[in-house]
Amino acid sequence: MSWELKMAKAIKILNSNAVWKSEGTSWDDVVIEWLEETTPISKEDIKAEMDKL
């Protein structure tokens, strides 16, 4: 599974209503922009959830 797909799944697990867009070529340089008043989720929390997938 690609890191992008893992990231998307992790974000949806942490906040099923999250709206975001991201840019980057790897997890290390990804920039996540939270849209539509979504409460931001820390990259550390997202990474921890990604590691479970």
Predicted regions and their residues:
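Interaction-interface detector
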Residues: M1-L53
